[in-house]
C-alpha cells in the first residue's frame, strides 16, 4: 500500500448530493472541521487505519444555508455555497498536510478526502453505516467543558452504525 507523505497532494472528492461516496471498501472515517481537536483525532484515525490495514476517509461537511430565498437571492446563495465548498476543500487539504507534517513517521496507508454538502450529524451517521470505525474529536475546551462531548461526537456515540472512537484533545498548558 502506498503511503502519503507530507509533501504529497491528496485529491479531494466533492460529493454535491449530500452523501458520502458509496461502493468503497469499509475503512476508518475521520470527521475533520479543521479545529485543533479534529486534527488530533485525524492523527489518531491515521494510526487506526494503519493498524487495521484499512483505507482512511477524511470527511468535512459543509452545511448549506436553508432553502426558500426570495427571487434573485438563490443565485447569490448558490455562489456562496460553492465558495464555501472550495474554502472547505482547501482547509481540509491544509489540515491533512498539518497532521502529516507533525507525524513522527509518514502515513503508510491509503487516504482520500471528501467534502460533502449536508447536515454534519446526518452525513456522519449515514457514512458510518459503511465504515469499520468512525473517529471524531471532542470539543476540548479545557476544564469542565473538556469533560463534555460536543453535539456531533455525542450523536455519533449514540447513533452511529459502526464503532466510534472519540479522541479527546491533548491536555493544554
Provide a role label for each language-model segment:
Residues 3-20, 60-91, 173:
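Acidic, proline/glycine-rich short linear motifs
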Residues 17-78, 127:
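Small/aliphatic-rich secondary-structure junction motif
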Residues 1-24, 37, 98-134, 171-173:
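Structural beta-alpha unit
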Residues 162-173:
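Short, flexible loop segments at boundaries between secondary-structure elements
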Residues 28, 45, 124, 135, ...:
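Hydrophobic structural packing positions in well-ordered secondary structure
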Residues 48, 52-55, 109, 133, ...:
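Short glycine/serine/threonine/alanine-rich loop segments
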Residues 133-158, 173:
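Glycine-rich, Arg-bearing micro-motifs that act as flexible, cationic patches
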Residues 57-59, 112-116, 165:
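General small-molecule cofactor/ligand-binding pocket signal
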Amino acid at each position: 500500500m502506498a503511503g502519503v507523505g507530507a509533501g504529497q497532494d491528496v485529491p479531494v472528492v466533492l460529493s454535491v448530493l449530500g452523501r458520502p461516496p458509496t461502493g468503497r471498501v469499509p475503512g476508518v472515517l475521520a470527521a475533520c472541521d479543521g479545529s485543533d481537536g479534529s486534527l488530533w483525532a485525524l492523527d489518531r484515525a491515521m494510526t487506526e487505519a494503519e493498524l487495521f490495514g484499512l483505507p482512511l476517509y477524511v470527511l468535512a461537511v459543509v452545511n448549506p444555508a436553508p432553502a426558500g430565498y426570495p427571487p434573485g437571492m438563490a443565485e447569490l446563495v448558490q455562489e456562496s455555497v460553492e465558495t464555501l465548498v472550495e474554502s472547505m476543500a482547501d482547509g481540509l487539504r491544509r489540515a491533512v498536510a498539518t497532521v502529516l507534517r507533525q507525524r513522527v513517521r509518514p502515513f503508510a496507508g491509503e487516504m482520500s478526502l471528501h467534502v460533502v454538502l449536508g447536515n454534519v450529524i446526518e452525513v456522519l451517521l449515514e457514512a458510518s453505516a459503511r465504515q469499520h470505525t468512525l473517529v471524531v474529536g471532542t470539543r476540548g475546551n479545557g476544564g469542565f467543558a473538556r469533560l463534555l462531548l460536543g453535539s456531533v461526537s455525542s450523536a455519533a456515540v449514540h447513533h452511529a452504525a459502526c464503532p466510534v472512537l472519540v479522541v479527546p484533545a491533548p491536555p493544554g498548558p
